[in-house]
């Protein structure tokens, strides 16, 4: 993979170079000391992946991510030494299309390969997303008599560009929105709590992490909060599970959507927002085949038109909509 590093700190650049050296297939093709330089270098030589710092002179990583995704889109991972202090910037960058975030690898520890492992895993996942994905088995639905009834649910999946899209969608809903909402966003567990807090503050909706064993409820927006998948169980409660182990993204949107197909017998709407790859497309199709309304974000309003495009390609979405129209449509569905 051809990789670029955008960072103004020589020690951080060296740490990233050393980490990447453990995987011979990775090649650093250029290094930029600020965001403005990175924008220009990306025009001249677009890499497969950019490792982007947040705090830099001239142009920061948030604006650089926005410019690059608009002009020469490629995969971007945010690399930071202080994720808690930079949490808002992290989610702003992800809103512009950054795929993920990882800590800067440590230099000088007793096990440099172990220190490099989190970064290398992120890159492996992104490399997989840029390739082809095999089809999933179709879900087998359970009869209505075998499950307990729940009333109204909105199941939302998002990835790259998701934080900003979720903020816009949730801002468009009133506090008394008459349906439970569960969000599955591709974000590492260490950032999930910060994302829930940020979404709560930015959108004005009560957003928190979903707890094992709780039931989706009206008036609360639940965000999948671990590196395991989240599922709806037969009794209507939520559970985290390591299975299936072969899913690259954890939590998987497909896994949650398919569990909704099996066990939710009230009204439900599936929404698939911006993101790279195909996660969520098959699950959305299963929801449509179950008789639920399914909505995919349109290309023009998507930061990364990957997952919604995959859904549209297999006719998984009943409706394809601009982002700003999705909240009003949900209100229309649940207030008739």
Swiss-Prot record:
Question: Which Gene Ontology CC terms are recorded?
Answer: cytoplasm
Where is the catalytic site?
Answer: 159, 186, 279
Q: Which residues carry this modification: 4-aspartylphosphate?
A: 53
Q: What does this protein do?
A: Involved in chemotaxis. Part of a chemotaxis signal transduction system that modulates chemotaxis in response to various stimuli. Catalyzes the demethylation of specific methylglutamate residues introduced into the chemoreceptors (methyl-accepting chemotaxis proteins or MCP) by CheR. Also mediates the irreversible deamidation of specific glutamine residues to glutamic acid.
Q: What is this protein's record name?
A: Protein-glutamate methylesterase/protein-glutamine glutaminase 3
Q: Where in the cell is it found?
A: Cytoplasm
Q: Which gene encodes it?
A: cheB3
Q: What is its main location?
A: cytoplasm
Q: Which Gene3D superfamilies match?
A: 3.40.50.2300, Methylesterase CheB, C-terminal domain
Keywords recorded for this protein, A-Z: Chemotaxis, Cytoplasm, Hydrolase, Phosphoprotein
Root EC class: hydrolase
**Listed EC numbers:** 3.1.1.61, 3.5.1.44
Recorded catalytic activity of this chain's protein:
[protein]-L-glutamate 5-O-methyl ester + H2O = L-glutamyl-[protein] + methanol + H(+); L-glutaminyl-[protein] + H2O = L-glutamyl-[protein] + NH4(+)
Q: Name one GO molecular function term.
A: protein-glutamate methylesterase activity
Q: Tell me where on the tree of life, at the top rank, the source sits.
A: Bacteria
The post-translation modification note in this UniProt entry reads: Phosphorylated by CheA. Phosphorylation of the N-terminal regulatory domain activates the methylesterase activity.
Q: What is known of its domains?
A: Contains a C-terminal catalytic domain, and an N-terminal region which modulates catalytic activity.
Domain Response regulatory residues, every copy = 2-119
């Amino acid at each position: 993979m051809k990789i670029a590093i955008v960072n103004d700190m020589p020690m951080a650049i060296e740490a990233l170079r050393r980490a990447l050296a453990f995987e011979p297939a990775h090649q650093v093709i250029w290094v930029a000391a600020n965001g403005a330089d990175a924008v220009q270098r990306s025009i001249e030589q677009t890499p497969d992946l950019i490792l982007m710092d947040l705090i830099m002179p001239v142009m920061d990583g948030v604006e650089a991510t926005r410019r690059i995704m608009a002009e020469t889109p490629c995969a971007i991972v945010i690399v930071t030494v202080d994720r808690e202090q930079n949490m808002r910037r992290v989610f702003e960058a992800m809103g512009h299309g950054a795929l993920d975030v990882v800590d800067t690898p440590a230099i000088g520890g007793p096990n440099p390969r172990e220190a490099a492992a989190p970064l290398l895993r992120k890159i492996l996942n992104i490399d997989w997303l840029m390739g082809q994905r095999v089809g999933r088995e179709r879900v087998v639905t359970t009869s209505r008599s075998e499950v307990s009834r729940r009333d109204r649910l909105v199941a939302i999946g998002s990835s790259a560009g998701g934080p900003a899209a979720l903020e816009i969608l949730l801002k468009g809903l009133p506090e008394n929105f008459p349906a439970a909402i569960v969000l599955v966003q591709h974000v590492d567990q260490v950032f999930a709590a910060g994302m829930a807090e940020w979404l709560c503050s930015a959108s004005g909706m009560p957003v928190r992490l979903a707890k094992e064993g709780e039931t989706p409820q009206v008036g609360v927006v639940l965000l999948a909060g671990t590196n395991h998948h989240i599922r709806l169980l037969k009794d209507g409660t939520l559970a985290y599970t390591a299975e299936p182990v072969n899913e690259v993204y954890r939590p998987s949107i497909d896994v949650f959507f398919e569990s909704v197909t099996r066990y939710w017998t009230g009204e439900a709407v599936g929404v698939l927002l911006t993101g790279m790859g195909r996660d969520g497309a098959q699950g959305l199709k299963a929801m449509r085949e179950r008789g639920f309304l399914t909505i995919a974000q349109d290309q023009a309003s998507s930061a990364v038109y990957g997952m919604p495009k995959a859904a549209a390609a297999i006719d998984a979405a009943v409706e394809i909509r601009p982002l700003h129209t999705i909240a009003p449509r949900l209100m229309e569905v649940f207030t008739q």
